[in-house]
Amino acid sequence: MTRMQQRTLMVMAGGTGGHVFPGLAVAHLMQAWGWRVVWLGNPNGMEATLVPKHGIPMEYVQFGGLRGKGMKTKLMLPVNLLRACMQSLSVLRRVKPDVVLGMGGYITFPAGMMTALSGTPLVLHEQNSIAGLANKVLAKLAKRVLVAFPKALPHAEWTGNPIREELARTTAPRQRYAARSGPLNVLVVGGSLGASALNEVVPRALAKLAPHERPRIVHQAGAKHIDALRANYEAAGIAAGDGAQLVPFIDDMTSAYANADLVICRSGAMTVAEIAAVGVAAFFVPFPYAVDDHQTTNAAFLADNGAALLVQQRDLSADALADWLRSQTRASLAEMAERSRSLAKPDATEQVAQICATVAGVTPSLSPEGKQQ
C-alpha cells in the first residue's frame, strides 16, 4: 500500500487493560498491513502512557463515568458530554479516519456517537459477556458489531477477543500435559491489583493438603500485596521457595500459562480469552463487584462447557479448595484444557482487522511485506 493509498484506522479505547490490549493487538496487525493507526483515548487513562510506547500517535477526549462520583459530577454530565462530543468531532476532522474501531471505555460513547453522525464507518467490539449501556446504544449505529462472547449483543458477529499472537501459537494441551510428571503445576493470578480472597484462601488450602499432595505453586499477587502474601504463606506453614514461588509480577504470561496444569484466577474478559487460547484448566473466582457481574458470565462460558470450574467468592473456602485440588489429576485437568482450547478464537485479531479493512472498502494485504514479522 503506497503512501498515497494509505488508509487510516482510528482505535478508540481506554480505561482498563481489557479495552486497551485487544485494541493494541488489532492496531499492530493493521500497521503491518500498511495502515496508519491513530489512537483516541483519555489523557488521564492508562492508554495515555501505554499506547505511545507502542509507537502509536494519540488524540485525546476528556470524558469519564458516573459510578462512584458525587452529585456535582452527575449534574455536570450534559456539559461534559457536549464538550466530549465537540472534542471528538474535532479529532475526526483532523485525523480523517477511513474506519473507527471502538473497543470500549467511557470515551467510546461520545466519540462513537460523533463517528456515526459524521458518516465515518464505525466498527464496535464488545469484550465482555454482558454489554454496557454505551455499547448497546452504539451497536444500533455501527456498521459491524463484534463480540467476544456469543449473544453479548443481538445480531452481532462472534469473533472472540483479539489477543497477542504468541498465545495462539502455544503447543497443544495434550502434548504439554503428557510431557509432565510429578506434582501438579498451579498458577495463581491476582493481577496487578492483587486478589485478596485468593491471597488468603490459597495458602490455607495448601496447608490442608499433605506434603505429597501439594502442587507446585506460582502465585502472582501485585506489588502492593506481595508482602501480605508472603505473610499468609508463612502463617500457613508453607515457606516461599518450598514448592511455592511468590512474585509481584509475571513478565511472560504466555509461558506462565503454558507451564501450568491449572490456573486459579479472576475472570476478566482478557483472562478468559487468554486461558482458552493457550488451553489450560481454570478455577475461576469472579470479582464480585464487577459491573453487571460480567465476570461470572465470562467464566460461565468456559465452565458451562466443562472447560473450567466457577466458584463465587462467597463460596470460596480453604476446605473446599483443598478437597477439589485433592480430587484432580493431571489427566482430568488436561481434559478441561482441551475443552478450553476448543472454545478459543485464535484468529480473533486478524478477523477484527479484516472486518475493519472491509468496512473501509479495502481488501487486506496479506503479502509477505504486509504480514507481521
Curated annotation (Swiss-Prot):
Protein residues bound to UDP-N-acetyl-alpha-D-glucosamine: T16, G17, G18, N128, R164, S192, I250, Q295
Catalytic activity: di-trans,octa-cis-undecaprenyl diphospho-N-acetyl-alpha-D-muramoyl-L-alanyl-D-glutamyl-meso-2,6-diaminopimeloyl-D-alanyl-D-alanine + UDP-N-acetyl-alpha-D-glucosamine = di-trans,octa-cis-undecaprenyl diphospho-[N-acetyl-alpha-D-glucosaminyl-(1->4)]-N-acetyl-alpha-D-muramoyl-L-alanyl-D-glutamyl-meso-2,6-diaminopimeloyl-D-alanyl-D-alanine + UDP + H(+)
Subcellular location: Cell inner membrane
Cellular compartments per GO CC: plasma membrane
Single biological process term from Gene Ontology: carbohydrate metabolic process
Matching CDD domains: GT28_MurG
Top EC category: transferase
Record EC number: 2.4.1.227
Keywords: Cell cycle, Cell division, Cell inner membrane, Cell membrane, Cell shape, Cell wall biogenesis/degradation, Glycosyltransferase, Membrane, Peptidoglycan synthesis, Transferase
Pfam families: Glyco_tran_28_C (PF04101), Glyco_transf_28 (PF03033)
Pathway as given in its UniProt record: Cell wall biogenesis; peptidoglycan biosynthesis
Principal location listed in the UniProt entry: membrane
Alphabetized GO MF terms: UDP-N-acetyl-D-glucosamine:N-acetylmuramoyl-L-alanyl-D-glutamyl-meso-2,6-diaminopimelyl-D-alanyl-D-alanine-diphosphoundecaprenol 4-beta-N-acetylglucosaminlytransferase activity; undecaprenyldiphospho-muramoylpentapeptide beta-N-acetylglucosaminyltransferase activity
Record flagged with keyword Ubl conjugation: no
Family: Belongs to the glycosyltransferase 28 family. MurG subfamily.
PANTHER family recorded: GLYCOSYLTRANSFERASE, UDP-N-ACETYLGLUCOSAMINE--N-ACETYLMURAMYL-(PENTAPEPTIDE) PYROPHOSPHORYL-UNDECAPRENOL N-ACETYLGLUCOSAMINE TRANSFERASE 1
Its biological purpose: Cell wall formation. Catalyzes the transfer of a GlcNAc subunit on undecaprenyl-pyrophosphoryl-MurNAc-pentapeptide (lipid intermediate I) to form undecaprenyl-pyrophosphoryl-MurNAc-(pentapeptide)GlcNAc (lipid intermediate II).
HAMAP family listed in its UniProt record: MurG
Name used for this protein in its record: UDP-N-acetylglucosamine--N-acetylmuramyl-(pentapeptide) pyrophosphoryl-undecaprenol N-acetylglucosamine transferase
Lineage: Bacteria, Pseudomonadati, Pseudomonadota, Betaproteobacteria, Burkholderiales
